[in-house]
Amino acid sequence: MSQAVKVERRETLKQKPNTSQLGFGKYFTDYMLSYDYDADKGWHDLKIVPYGPIEISPAAQGVHYGQSVFEGLKAYKRDGEVALFRPEENFKRLNNSLARLEMPQVDEAELLEGLKQLVDIERDWIPEGEGQSLYIRPFVFATEGALGVGASHQYKLLIILSPSGAYYGGETLKPTKIYVEDEYVRAVRGGVGFAKVAGNYAASLLAQTNANKLGYDQVLWLDGVEQKYIEEVGSMNIFFVENGKVITPELNGSILPGITRKSIIELAKNLGYEVEERRVSIDELFESYDKGELTEVFGSGTAAVISPVGTLRYEDREIVINNNETGEITQKLYDVYTGIQNGTLEDKNGWRVVVPKY
């Protein structure tokens, strides 16, 4: 698709926020991308419209039965050039999530073109400070106003944009405290753990709140059958460094196939590190720590990119990783990864997609 997407212009534009106080997900740009689906027409009426409230039926099936999926990616600006980071991977995963919830597939190329035009219109909203970016949230939900469990015949896709501050406030990486959850489970194989569906996040909130009350930042989930194999953290995939080797749980159908995870694996190999994707039990992890072999732990995700783990608690035992300091490999991966994202380091893998001026 190369033709321009229809744009419905606002009469007045918003005042842009102070870029030193952005935080995450607090401010939204002037426009959003909108796309509608019904069983007779398919996807239609792709357009850019003013950001604002939308009207849905009180009986909208997405509200009642949970047909709702989303994605998250970022755009970066440097010296006037705007680039997306691996957006094609997000739209592939979006389609995988849609398929799992019996929702209609989207044309990935068409959607990417629409996103580029939206980001181009909003390029003045993209902050250029250290660690800052434009967060992009595509999401799809069922809108048919009818009760009764079944796949909806109508859907809406929206893409909204939010200028975001540096995750670490422009400071050095800050190790997090992780609580290993051994009562609740996030997902089971054959379920929706591999998909980015809204319900996965709702189901994690109780355990997350309990962990916060105990003084921990996030929850580390174990498998849903034996509750012994490590899967992922609440909003991140998880990595371990043992004797210089980078290890991460293998994808098994209940772990989200993170795009940052995929990129970190490729990057680590390019940098000469040995990488293993395999099952890792929580007992093995603690044994590795006791032997002095576990030297670093970090999470990966769109928001933080890489988040070092300084403290890990399982049952009645708490361990401190690397004296609660960011490890050498963790820091190296973060520096190179973010350098590629923001354009200060060479993009040898072709991950950055430059947004043209239309």
Curated annotation (Swiss-Prot):
NCBIfam families: ilvE_II, PRK13357.1. Keywords: Amino-acid biosynthesis, Aminotransferase, Branched-chain amino acid biosynthesis, Pyridoxal phosphate, Transferase. Its cofactor is pyridoxal 5'-phosphate. One of its GO terms (molecular function) is L-isoleucine-2-oxoglutarate transaminase activity. GO terms for biological process: isoleucine biosynthetic process; L-leucine biosynthetic process; L-valine biosynthetic process. It comes from Staphylococcus aureus (strain Mu50 / ATCC 700699). Pathway: Amino-acid biosynthesis; L-isoleucine biosynthesis; L-isoleucine from 2-oxobutanoate: step 4/4; Amino-acid biosynthesis; L-leucine biosynthesis; L-leucine from 3-methyl-2-oxobutanoate: step 4/4; Amino-acid biosynthesis; L-valine biosynthesis; L-valine from pyruvate: step 4/4. It catalyses: L-leucine + 2-oxoglutarate = 4-methyl-2-oxopentanoate + L-glutamate; L-isoleucine + 2-oxoglutarate = (S)-3-methyl-2-oxopentanoate + L-glutamate; L-valine + 2-oxoglutarate = 3-methyl-2-oxobutanoate + L-glutamate. Pfam families: Aminotran_4. This is Probable branched-chain-amino-acid aminotransferase. Its EC number is 2.6.1.42. The gene is ilvE.
